Amino acid sequence: VVATPEKLEHNHEQSSGQQRVAVLLMGYGEVESYEDFANYNEQALHLLTAKFAPVPAWIYPPLARILALFDRHEWGHQHNDFISPHNAIFEKQRAGIEKNLQQKWGDRVQVFKAFNFCAPFLPHQVLAEIKNQGFDKLLIYPLLVVDSIFTSGIAIEQVNKALSQLTDGSEHWVKGLRYIPSFYNEAAYIDMMVHLVEEKIASDLAAAYLPAEIGIVLMNHGCPHKAKGFTSGITESQALYDLIRDKLINRYPLISIGWLNHDTPLIEWTQPNVEQAAKNLIQLGAKAVMFMPIGFATENHETLLDVHHIIHALEKKHFQVNYVQMPCVNDHPDFLAMAAQWANPHIADLLSEEATTVNPQLAVAHHHHH
């Protein structure tokens, strides 16, 4: 449930007559019931695959059902009825960020979560709830490291669609809006990535391996090279990797970017993929390989299952190598504190600025004249 009636009443009582901001924290969401695979896949095909793959729309429903069979096999049979922890972790992130924000702003700020593909937290459902609670200022905050058409881009697409459906007459209910597209270059996040790597090496690897024998694969979400002119995420992902690498390379020479790609036919993806990156480091003398997710803030089936598959495949050929799989930042208190910190200036702007009234009826079609 997004909010209980008691909480609703309490909020109105305390906040009447003062400015309030709703923070819309957005993530992908993952299925928790295997029955939902086909529906989830069809939405993902429409919103994600359509941005880069030349696939006609009529093929989405049958393709989604076929993909659901593969998903069920992988999650159910290969991984002992795996249930993704993604949604539960995201809720902890939402609660933790809200707690941090409310220490500064009190009940003037509330954090709502929305999932791109999972009811009952679809953007249109959550925005309807935000409107019902009387909020008129909105901070759109996809909790995604890198900005691309596949992350923050679809968040904005869904929010725009939902807001147009929630418009009443001649005055729009949203009076102020801000947006945080990504945090790939935030110093606090970069330093945290470096610290987590160094900490793990010190506790698990430093006693048995020379620094030059420790391979580090810094994992980003794979990106197709062509995305119909949309921002694909490659530039920010590469910049994120470079910033972290620069802080580690003098002590640990064996570092590589590794892209967690989706193997789709006819589509050129970023290279090297994670498995190839690890093989390259092993070839250069790595006796231990660490897999560190940098382009993912919340654990999901890719960071868990895909990396598990990759390690399993590597173990068959290079059984003498020690493999270390690192978690995402998830609900680490330091991450939740910094994520709240990034929102503070935008919340301050929203609370201090004059309300802007938008009349949707003025947006009539203008013909282009030569």
Each model region followed by its residue ranges:
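Active-site-proximal alpha-helix that buttresses catalytic centers in soluble enzyme cores
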Residues: V2-H370
